[in-house]
């Protein structure tokens, strides 16, 4: 099984790439974590928010594997604890299907793309900088894996 993060936005600050890379590198070979960036629609074109999200959704769809479990990151998604995410990761692994976590752009994800999701997760009830999602999600997935393996990284 593979974990794939498909995220809208390119040219992130170096700290984002370093943070994501650190936790992606720690993931085991049997559960690799990869990132695919898709171009955000320029906000200066005069298009409506809906049109921009639709254009980004088309790019996201093109980046998705043919078969995968789609998990949308959404402010209205399930709010999981670390232990609950670990159980979810365990269930994903048992299912054997690759899992793609989808991160929208500044305006979020189109309703049509959201409708294709198998599930929705929320990282936090706080409003966070968009760039912070990648390293935060990578760390959360690594921590969930460490819980499942009784690795000392996570402490209760």
Swiss-Prot record:
Highest taxon in the source lineage: Bacteria
An example molecular function term from Gene Ontology annotations: rRNA (pseudouridine-N3-)-methyltransferase activity
InterPro entries xref list: Alpha/beta_knot_MTases, RlmH-like, tRNA_m1G_MTases_N
Residues involved in S-adenosyl-L-methionine binding: 73, 104, 123-128
GO cellular component, one term: cytoplasm
Subunit comment: Homodimer.
Protein name in the entry: Ribosomal RNA large subunit methyltransferase H
High-level lineage: Bacteria, Pseudomonadati, Pseudomonadota, Betaproteobacteria, Rhodocyclales
Gene name, Swiss-Prot/TrEMBL: rlmH
